[in-house]
Amino acid sequence: RDLRMSRGLGDVYKRQAAERAGETAGYAETSRDFTFNASAAHDENSREVYVLVIGETARACNFGLYGYERNTTPLLDKMEGVVTFTDVLTQSNTTHKSVPMLLSAASAEDYDCLYRQKGIITAFKEAGFHTAFFSNQLPNHSFIDFLGMEADDWKFIKKDAPKGANISDDELLFLVEKELKAGHQKLFIVLHAYG
């Protein structure tokens, strides 16, 4: 009896996984008409540059910027305008769920809104910003890809690398430098680091 019940549950989970895969594949269609109705809050002539770094396996407790006893962030410590978030926890312990929640309004309680809504990159675009998304991860037809590819410029730097290559997150900085030199008055960049 227990074996039959576990097979039945397995079938339920497989069916749910197939349904989710279909819903995910249809993201472009189901979110097409979504809008934030966002607008800029600052003078259009003032330069604004925002960089959101999603550090995957990087741990705040190992950053000097967050009080770690070794100075592991000497350059960040000297920069003006750096904002650290000290009271933030992820709502999921898996990349495929936590990163989309960071890039959107979705939470663990209403994760399904991802199928109908766009992310923070689109909000910045609506507000008149040039947007960029650069990732040191491989694309995998997930919400991370979909939300990232809403940007004006996007690149997954591991995509063209030899299989199994270990690419340093520093490589993302060349893409940031290129965006900064392009002279966009309003710029929002998301870096999805390997950590």
Predicted regions and their residues:
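Helix-loop-helix transmembrane hairpins and adjacent membrane-interface loops
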Residues: 1-7
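Active-site-proximal alpha/beta segments of enzymes that process anionic O-linked groups
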Residues: 7, 11-52, 57-195
